[in-house]
Curated annotation (Swiss-Prot):
Cellular location(s): Cell inner membrane
Primary site of residence: membrane
Keywords, ordered alphabetically: Cell inner membrane, Cell membrane, Glycosyltransferase, Lipid A biosynthesis, Lipid biosynthesis, Lipid metabolism, Lipopolysaccharide biosynthesis, Membrane, Transferase, Transmembrane, Transmembrane helix
A single GO BP: protein O-linked glycosylation
GO molecular function, one term: pentosyltransferase activity
InterPro entries, per database record: ArnT_tfrase (IPR022839), Glyco_trans_39/83 (IPR003342), LipidA_mod_glycosyltrf_83 (IPR050297)
Lineage: Bacteria, Pseudomonadati, Pseudomonadota, Gammaproteobacteria, Enterobacterales
Record keyword Transmembrane present: yes
UniProt cross-references to Pfam families, sorted A to Z: PMT
Protein's name according to its UniProt entry: Undecaprenyl phosphate-alpha-4-amino-4-deoxy-L-arabinose arabinosyl transferase
Catalytic activity, EC: 2.4.2.43
């Protein structure tokens, strides 16, 4: 009976965090609008080989993540939930692997359930796992690969070992097809310390080639198909999207070596109090094979991405699966022997909630700031933000009432965040970061436009997805579409600032021309170097400028 209650509680937890509130949040640009539009175009065109954005070749990532996103929109429609359905599914599948692997290591159902709940409630997992990017997909394949390798190395027969390594190759192949060759480097680096300490080189060399073969066979059909259709894909994807992004001096998202320290601290909420003890206990028990495996899984990718020049928080998402297992194991030991870490965790959550309440007041219309984040007419959003932090502090306090039994309720600290964050975003943020909001405000003007131009790729993708059209033209800036715009068949999809007046004269009689520009908050739009317009509609950071036929 208790198991049934636990399962009902888990399903309610998943529904409140990962299902019910998702549609209330508008899509963020540039990431969510980009991936939403790529998948929409894939469904509309029926081309499941070559990814396109705004009708242009888009070679920043391989194809598998777009497949999953497209299936999400196909099943649930072109809406906020449909766009995010794929990442939510991947996150829940990863949580299922955490459950299975924890059971496999410790044969303890309660521990497995706690590890799953901890994983799903980690701030970084929830933030990325409900955000339509490709990282939850690659995290799933990496976690599946680590589970497959363990399964292979623990098998007692050659059939079991062979099956495990074949499965490992498939997961690595799907990882390559999702985000590239890092899906090969990360698992290898993660298992090497364990293989070395356990002296399991023989099995690795005997059966490892099976993983190589299955990985190649997984990637080969699509790899050959896109090479035939687009011969430049692999050259661009390898040199620009791998070498330049991560290793060269001009790598994207450059950050210092210690970049991931604050990411891990913030990402571990609401379980931050367990982090030091989980790592220390894991190190102290490093003679235990499973503990070494989890430690290596956590630390090695972290070191690898810390050394790389290009860094983003999303890169280390897969590390938190193993960290959640270490945290759950340590938490049960602490509850039984010394609950000090659990008390510290409760106080950290109280402090975080109270700090958030104070910070919300400071940036509210009633605070000391001259330019508050929220305006007076948005008071309900301020109360939503207060509710988010109040619930965080409340559940932090509740875990202290009988800490040996109530500590798992820290998983409910982010409940207010999950349910209310979509209602608390300030209008000034929505107007710049949520193109859907802009489209809703300007729908009547945008809909009849013959041509739409914009100077932001993220806004362009949002307009294209909302209006169900892929012919948005880039104005002045090419951004990440620079490569696709270099192809001869992309002629006419970019208009420079100097060319705009002539282009306008040539196309004005064909219908309404709409220009959507991103501007600074205090920028005078009358000073823009553009021909006089027939209509201007400013929505804070975005401005709609229209030219009608004459």
């Amino acid at each position: 009976m208790k198991s049934v209650r636990y399962l009902i509680g888990l399903f309610a937890f998943i529904a409140c965090y990962y299902l019910l509130p998702i549609s209330t949040r508008l899509l963020w640009q540039p990431d969510e609008t980009r991936y939403a539009e790529i998948s929409r175009e894939m469904l509309a065109s029926g081309d499941w080989i070559v990814p396109h954005l705004l009708g242009l070749r888009y070679f920043e990532k391989p194809i598998a993540g777009y497949w999953i996103n497209s299936i999400g929109q196909w099943l649930f429609g072109a809406n906020n939930f449909g766009v995010r359905a794929g990442v939510i599914f991947a996150t829940l599948l990863t949580a299922a692997l955490v459950t299975w692997f924890t059971l496999r290591l410790w044969r303890d159902k309660r521990l497995a359930l706690l590890a799953t709940v901890i994983y799903l409630s980690l701030f970084i997992v929830y933030a990325i796992g409900t955000y339509a990017v490709l990282d939850p997909f690659i995290a799933f394949w990496l976690v599946a690969g680590m589970c497959s390798f363990w399964l292979a190395m623990q098998a007692q027969t050659w059939k079991g070992k062979s099956a495990g390594f074949l499965l490992l190759g498939i997961t690595c192949g799907m990882g390559v097809m999702t985000k590239g060759f890092l899906a090969l480097a990360v698992p290898v680096l993660s298992v090497l310390p364990w293989v070395a300490t356990q002296k399991r080189w023989k099995d690795l060399f005997i059966y490892g080639w099976l993983a190589v073969i299955s990985c190649v066979l997984t990637v080969l059909p699509w790899g050959l198909a896109i090479a035939q259709r687009e011969p430049n894909f692999w050259h661009y994807f390898f040199w620009v999207e791998h070498i330049q992004r991560f290793a060269l001096d001009d790598a994207q998202h450059r950050a210092p070596f210690w970049y991931y320290v604050p990411v891990i601290i913030a990402g571990s909420l609401p379980w931050l109090g367990l982090l030091p003890g989980a790592l220390y206990t894991g190190w102290k028990n490093r003679k235990h094979s499973a503990t070494v495996y989890l430690l290596s899984w956590t630390i090695m990718p972290l070191l690898f991405f810390s050394v790389a020049k290009g860094k983003l928080p999303t890169y280390i998402l897969s590390c938190f699966a193993s960290l959640a297992m270490l945290m759950a194991h340590y938490a049960l030991l602490a509850a039984k022997n010394n609950p000090l870490a659990l008390r510290i965790n409760g106080w950290i959550n109280i402090a975080f909630g109270v700090t958030g309440i104070i910070a919300t007041f400071v940036v509210s219309p009633w605070g000391p700031m001259n330019t508050p984040v929220w305006q007076t007419f948005e008071s309900y959003k301020v109360f939503c933000a207060w509710s988010i932090f109040s619930l965080w502090a409340f559940f932090g306090w509740y875990t202290l009432t009988n800490v040996e039994k109530t500590w798992p309720f820290a998983a409910l600290c982010p409940l207010g965040l999950a349910l209310l964050v979509g209602f608390s975003i300030p209008d000034r943020v929505m107007e710049g970061k949520h193109p859907q909001f802009f489209v809703e405000m300007t729908q009547e003007s945008l809909q009849p436009s013959r041509y739409i131009l914009t100077d932001s790729v993220g806004v362009a993708a949002g307009l294209a997805w909302s209006l169900q059209r892929d012919d948005i033209i880039m104005y002045r800036q090419t951004g990440e579409l620079k490569y696709g715009l270099n192809y001869p068949d992309a002629k006419g999809r970019f208009v420079s600032g100097d060319e705009f007046a002539n282009w306008l004269n040539q196309h004005r009689q064909e219908g309404i021309i709409t220009l959507v520009l991103s501007v600074d908050r205090d920028e005078d739009i009358n000073s823009l170097a553009i021909p006089p317009a027939d209509a201007i509609d400013r929505q804070e950071r975005l401005v709609l400028i229209q030219y009608r036929p004459k």
